[in-house]
């Protein structure tokens, strides 16, 4: 038996019993004292991140599970470093076309939120000298698909240099049912912050498709609505502010799992959705139900007119309208700031193609410049692309699909053709998806136009 024991080795590092001081046996596995010390260091590091201090009697370690060192947390915002509302809106104007009213609402709301964090000072400083408590105001964005709801939230996080996470409300279910727990939203934010709890607690979470968790009727149902009203109930404490237990590996929580604690009282939640049919609810309350038909000129202008009218009606939105739509009053009360985004017209789509810093025209010009090809778009070609995107009724998302279809053959052939150094996208090429006008530079050979 002693001879057999001499061949025992650690199941993790592979060292034999003679190479270590202690070898502990388990059901079919063995672990040495060195691996136990390494595990303790990893656990100490996770507890430091979750609670801000190491375990009692243990010295903090700077090692991570990957063997590297963690970056230090960024300093908390101060009243002097927070950008003013006009500065925030100016930055949004560089990235997002149109939506002036929504950008103004969000600029003020975000400024007040981070001003509140600076005032609190993590429970110290100025806030300790006054009895006034500042409560956070989450934001509800209402607008059709492709109008810029996600981009607005993402641009705000980029400017403020805070972690940003996007969640899909349609994948969430009430605890105990198949689907994602609401705590998994916080895990995504934590991962964006490199598992830095302090940094994650100053981040922004955007919950998309929030209108899809509306309950089926205004009256409470006697049956269980695990993906509708049940999710709204589960989100209440998280939106208001609570200390949530987040499983570090995701998935369902169980009693024997170590969880990371995150305080959500400083996290800004932005919820967005299309809310199709909400304008009808508002019109019914205002007594403006119209009976009749809108003439169609064959180019879909009746649909565009209806979208614009819907956005105008939603400016008179009241909390009771959202209750009739299917959101519970407790959920609406935790989203005190709301902004309505308007549908994008053809002129706005043209601006999106050319004006922002990351405009599609600039992106594809940069891609082809890496192949020493200068790409240009005629003004009429840009108009044709915007017109086609407007016809597809998916907002700005349609633009990339159209340009990708348009550029497929060109980006396949041009990198291999050394004779072409410039290319111009024309209106005819957009309308027919064939041909193009090649503009060779002096000393280059004329490239054949495709049929």
Swiss-Prot record:
Pfam families: AAA_2, ClpB_D2-small, zf-C4_ClpX. The keyword Zinc applies. ATP binds at residues 144-151. Zn(2+) binds at residues 10, 13, 32, 35. One of its GO terms (molecular function) is zinc ion binding. Keywords: ATP-binding, Chaperone, Metal-binding, Nucleotide-binding, Zinc. Residues 50-79 are annotated as: Disordered. One of its GO terms (cellular component) is HslUV protease complex. Residues 1-51 form the ClpX-type ZB domain. GO terms for biological process: cell division; proteolysis involved in protein catabolic process. The keyword Metal-binding applies. Component of the ClpX-ClpP complex. Forms a hexameric ring that, in the presence of ATP, binds to fourteen ClpP subunits assembled into a disk-like structure with a central cavity, resembling the structure of eukaryotic proteasomes. ATP-dependent specificity component of the Clp protease. It directs the protease to specific substrates. Can perform chaperone functions in the absence of ClpP. NCBIfam families: clpX, PRK05342.1. Belongs to the ClpX chaperone family. HAMAP family: ClpX. This is ATP-dependent Clp protease ATP-binding subunit ClpX.
């Amino acid at each position: 038996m002693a001879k057999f024991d001499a061949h025992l080795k650690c199941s993790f590092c592979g060292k034999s019993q003679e190479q270590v001081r202690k070898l502990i046996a388990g059901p079919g596995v063995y672990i040495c004292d060195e691996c136990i010390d390494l595990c303790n260091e990893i656990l100490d590091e996770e507890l430091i991140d979750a609670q801000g201090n190491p375990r009692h009697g243990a010295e903090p370690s700077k090692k991570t599970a990957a063997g590297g060192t963690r970056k230090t947390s960024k300093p908390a915002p101060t009243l002097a470093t927070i950008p003013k509302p006009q500065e925030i809106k100016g930055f949004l104007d560089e990235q997002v076309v149109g939506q002036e009213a929504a950008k103004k609402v969000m600029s003020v709301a975000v400024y007040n939120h981070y001003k509140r964090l600076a005032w609190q000072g993590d429970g110290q400083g100025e806030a300790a000298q006054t009895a006034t408590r500042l409560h956070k105001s989450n934001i509800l964005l209402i607008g059709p698909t492709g109008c810029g709801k996600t981009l607005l939230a993402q641009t705000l996080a980029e400017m403020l240099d805070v972690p940003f996470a996007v969640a899909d409300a349609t994948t969430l279910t009430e605890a105990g049912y198949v689907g994602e727990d609401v705590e998994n939203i916080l895990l995504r934010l934590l991962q964006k912050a490199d598992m830095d709890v302090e940094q994650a607690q100053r981040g922004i979470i955007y919950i998309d498709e929030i209108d899809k968790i509306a309950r089926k009727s205004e009256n409470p149902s006697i049956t269980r609505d695990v993906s509708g009203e049940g999710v709204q109930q589960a989100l209440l404490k998280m939106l208001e502010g609570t200390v949530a237990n987040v499983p570090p590996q995701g998935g369902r929580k169980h009693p024997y799992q170590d969880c990371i604690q995150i305080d959500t009282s400083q996290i800004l939640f932005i919820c967005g959705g299309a809310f199709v049919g909400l304008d009808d609810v508002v019109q019914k309350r205002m007594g403006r139900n119209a009976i009749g038909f809108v003439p169609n000129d064959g180019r879909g202008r009746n649909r565009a007119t209806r979208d614009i009218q819907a956005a105008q009606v939603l400016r008179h939105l009241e909390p009771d309208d959202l209750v009739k739509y299917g959101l519970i009053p407790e959920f609406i009360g935790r989203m005190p700031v709301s902004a309505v985004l308007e549908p994008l017209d053809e002129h706005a789509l043209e601006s999106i193609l050319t004006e922002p810093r990351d405009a599609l025209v600039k992106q594809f010009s940069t891609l082809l410049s890496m192949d020493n090809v200068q790409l240009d778009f005629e003004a009429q070609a840009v108009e044709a692309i915007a017109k086609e995107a407007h016809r597809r009724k998916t907002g700005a998302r349609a633009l990339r699909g159209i340009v990708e279809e348009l550029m497929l053959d060109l980006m396949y052939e041009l990198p291999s053709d050394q004779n072409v150094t410039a290319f111009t996208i024309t209106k005819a090429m957009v309308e027919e998806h064939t041909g193009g006008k090649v503009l060779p530079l002096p000393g280059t050979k004329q490239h054949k136009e495709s049929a």
